[in-house]
């Protein structure tokens, strides 16, 4: 299928396109792919017979800079991170926040948020995912030693202590996040933020495995070292060639994970991307299609071309202090 996402910003039209073969999966799975989240569980309609080989080869646009949720920056990294790691919340097919590791949540005056974690959420090594994992992850995210590109992301949620931590005035342990018990996480904000829970679909808020990081250091994301809590785990990584993920049997919703293996390719050329799809080498292209090919492909393979609106925001951060 080709997915064409038109983006109108500042009077400039942009297109994002990808292609996915319908013969691979049922409609529900296809919808999950179109949402950009392969890991999203799917309900296979009654009477639908899936293809015998449930594997997916997709272009990811470029080589990733990292698989560490606190070191990633771009869309290619986020695509894979969402398959490997699951945060408190995820996005559903319509882009709305939905339960992830947290099966429910509540708040007091939009300032103190409590997340109730699934008791069956596990890491790929079989150990349980706990509230302490999120405390460690969020503290690591804002730690200057981590140098995370998204260290300031939690500032949008106004988590207590974060401004002073990022300024080096307080230790990371003063961040307003606390494990009440293994399955209850409490987050205290410096002011009411009604939309706080919506921020938690971002990959940088996912838990990370403390034991693996402490054991392997910077090499913790390599095959054989990495421990994940999402629908997939890392099988193979050949830089500038491919990244292969395989279904994780310990994932809490594994029964509804349909695709057994996902291979990501770093194809930068949009023309090459389309050509390799049409030759049968890949099942799904990246988001960008050469605009000059859109009408031609829409005519030749209309069932494989899908058009979606693309929403994004451009903004400037002005330093008005100096």
Predicted features along the sequence, with ranges:
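N-terminal lobe/hinge region of extracytoplasmic solute-binding protein
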Residues: 59-109, 139, 225-228
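Ligand-site clamp/hinge motif
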Residues: 217-223, 249-296, 311
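A bilobed periplasmic-binding-protein/Venus flytrap-type ligand-binding module shared by bacterial periplasmic
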Residues: 92, 246-250, 310-322
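Aromatic- and charge-enriched surface segment that lines or borders ligand/interaction sites
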Residues: 103-150, 186, 276
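Ligand-binding "clamshell"
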Residues: 43-44, 294-307
């Amino acid at each position: 299928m080709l997915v064409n996402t038109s983006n109108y910003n500042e009077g400039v039209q942009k297109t994002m396109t990808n292609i996915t073969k319908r013969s691979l999966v049922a409609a529900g799975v296809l919808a999950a792919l179109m949402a950009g989240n392969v890991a999203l569980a799917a309900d296979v309609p009654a009477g639908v017979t899936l293809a015998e080989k449930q594997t997916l080869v997709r272009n990811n646009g470029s080589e990733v800079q990292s698989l560490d949720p606190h070191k990633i920056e771009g869309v290619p990294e986020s695509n894979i991170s969402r398959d490997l790691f699951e945060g408190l919340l995820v996005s559903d097919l319509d882009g709305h926040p939905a339960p992830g590791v947290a099966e429910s949540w509540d708040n007091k005056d939009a300032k103190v948020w409590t997340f109730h974690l699934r008791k069956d959420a596990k890491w790929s090594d079989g150990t349980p995912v706990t509230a302490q994992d999120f405390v460690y992850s969020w503290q690591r995210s804002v730690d200057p030693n981590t140098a995370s590109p998204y260290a300031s992301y939690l500032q949008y949620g106004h988590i207590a202590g974060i401004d002073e931590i990022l300024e080096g005035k307080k230790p990371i342990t003063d961040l307003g996040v606390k494990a009440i018990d293994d399955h209850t996480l409490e987050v205290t904000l410096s002011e009411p933020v009604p939309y706080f829970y919506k921020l938690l679909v971002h990959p940088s808020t996912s838990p990370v495995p403390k034991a693996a990081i402490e054991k392997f250091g910077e090499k913790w994301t390599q095959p054989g070292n990495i421990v994940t809590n999402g629908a997939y785990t890392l099988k193979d990584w050949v830089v500038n060639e491919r990244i292969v993920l395989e279904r994780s049997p310990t994932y809490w919703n594994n029964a509804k994970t349909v695709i057994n293996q996902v291979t990501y390719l770093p194809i930068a050329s949009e023309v090459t991307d389309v050509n390799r799809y049409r030759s049968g080498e890949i099942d799904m292209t990246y988001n960008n299609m050469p605009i000059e090919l859109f009408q031609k492909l829409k005519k030749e393979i209309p069932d494989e071309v899908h058009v979606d609106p693309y929403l994004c925001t451009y903004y400037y951060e002005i330093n008005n202090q100096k």
